[in-house]
């Protein structure tokens, strides 16, 4: 199947294509007016539970809270004086001599998605992992999405404020350059952000990014990249979830699904039984207490679901069907407008579409690198984290 895809791509990449009007319009500079938006205050009953759990989680990763790693809520104000706060996991004492890495998480998750990379990366970089506004444990503004462009502009403008505060307002006395990484929906956001605000970005790492491929190009078949099971789920999502704009939070508060989601959500399927993943380079255990660690992750995931007013419905306005097809594909913009090197990584059993990444690699193999892990699926960053270490060593 991989060879078949590459043959199709080689035939297609020789044909020059114009960037669609949709892609051009998505890059145009715009502003978001949300003066009527009601932004909630930090909810103390959630915050009082979240911080102790995060502290315990990272201590279970052999990281000292307040010395190696810390989390905080940073205040943000947009151009219309709307106030937000962003929950940020970061290096506790940023080193001005180290390089910086900023991570953007994906759909129905938080910055904790990258937990398995933190013990390795924190020794080499200042790391900053914000929860996207409206997700994780950041504030939940009541934004009413209406179109792909408006949704994208909101997310990009918010991240512009976050990144300006971290790197360009001397908040932490660090370098103004940084590496940018995005996973899934976060990969879509990172790509769009890079095209609009390239200042300071050294390289970009896209982990199974959504929204890259332009499915209007002949021969790009979404279903051909999925096994039968995922293709069936794909059709179910198309016919049921998408028209109704159902969120995980909606399912969670529904009596019919409450117990099911509560029992399963947050139990990440990382390979704790594999020694190369369980152990750090110095031989110490990667996770001190595995069962306790799973319990903490589950409790944090449940708190995120119980935290009212999430904005995860943004995907219904950005994508025509998860996780591949988007109203505003990025492939053409990256091919003709991008000046920054990008590394794409996909899991061995990843359901995410790779056509666009392969076409970009064929177009310019020096600027666009692509790798597939030997283990893991869409969430290989915690299923098989050490496979990413050589990529960090080589490119970052």
Which residue stretches match the model-derived regions?
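Catalytic histidine neighborhood in serine/cysteine hydrolases
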Residues: 362-378
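Catalytic histidine-centered segment of alpha/beta-hydrolase-like enzymes
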Residues: 352-353, 376-385
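Flexible "cap/lid" subdomain of the alpha/beta-hydrolase fold that forms the substrate-access gate
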Residues: 148-152, 159-160, 197-363
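Structural signature of beta-strand start/N-cap positions in the alpha/beta core
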Residues: 100, 126, 177-179, 202-203, ...
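Conserved HGGG/HGGXW glycine-rich cap/lid loop of the alpha/beta-hydrolase fold
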Residues: 84, 89-141, 183-188, 196
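The conserved SAM/SAH-binding core of class I Rossmann-like methyltransferase domains
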Residues: 102, 128-130, 207, 345, ...
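Active-site loop/oxyanion-hole signature of alpha/beta-hydrolase fold enzymes
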Residues: 132-181, 197, 217
């Amino acid at each position: 199947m991989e060879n078949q895809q590459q043959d199709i791509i080689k035939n297609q990449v020789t044909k020059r294509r114009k960037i669609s009007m949709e892609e051009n319009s998505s890059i145009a500079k715009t502003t978001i007016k949300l003066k009527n938006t009601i932004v909630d205050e930090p909810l103390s009953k959630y915050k009082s539970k979240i911080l102790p759990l995060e502290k315990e989680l990272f201590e279970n990763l052999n990281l000292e809270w307040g010395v190696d790693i810390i989390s905080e809520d940073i205040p943000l104000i947009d151009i219309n004086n709307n106030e937000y706060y962003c929950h940020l996991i970061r290096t506790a004492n940023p080193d001005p001599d180290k390089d910086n890495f900023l991570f953007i998480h994906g759909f129905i998750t938080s910055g904790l998605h990258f937990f398995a990379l933190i013990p390795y990366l924190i020794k080499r970089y200042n790391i900053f992992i914000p929860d996207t506004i409206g997700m994780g444990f950041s504030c939940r503004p009541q934004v009413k999405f209406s179109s792909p462009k408006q949704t994208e502009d909101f997310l990009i403008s918010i991240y512009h404020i976050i990144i300006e505060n971290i790197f360009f307002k001397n908040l932490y006395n660090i370098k103004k350059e940084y590496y940018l990484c995005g996973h899934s929906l976060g990969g879509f956001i990172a790509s769009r952000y890079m095209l609009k605000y390239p200042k300071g970005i050294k390289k970009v790492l896209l982990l199974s990014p959504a929204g890259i491929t332009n499915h209007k190009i002949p021969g790009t078949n979404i279903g051909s990249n999925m096994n039968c099971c995922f293709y069936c789920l794909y059709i179910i999502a198309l016919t049921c979830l998408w028209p109704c704009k159902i969120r995980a939070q909606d399912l969670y508060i529904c009596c019919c699904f409450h117990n099911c989601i509560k029992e399963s959500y947050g139990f990440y399927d990382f390979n704790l039984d594999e020694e190369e993943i369980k152990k750090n380079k110095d031989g110490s255990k990667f996770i001190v207490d595995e069962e306790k660690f799973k319990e903490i992750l589950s409790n944090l995931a449940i708190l995120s679901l119980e935290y009212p007013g999430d904005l995860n419905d943004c995907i219904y306005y950005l994508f025509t069907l998860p996780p591949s097809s988007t109203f505003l594909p990025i492939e053409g913009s990256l091919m003709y407008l991008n000046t920054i090197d990008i590394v794409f990584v996909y899991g061995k059993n990843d359901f995410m579409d790779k056509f666009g990444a392969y076409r970009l690699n064929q177009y310019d193999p020096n600027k666009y690198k692509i790798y597939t892990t030997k283990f893991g699926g869409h969430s290989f960053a915690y299923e098989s984290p050490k496979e990413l270490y050589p990529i960090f060593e080589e490119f970052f």
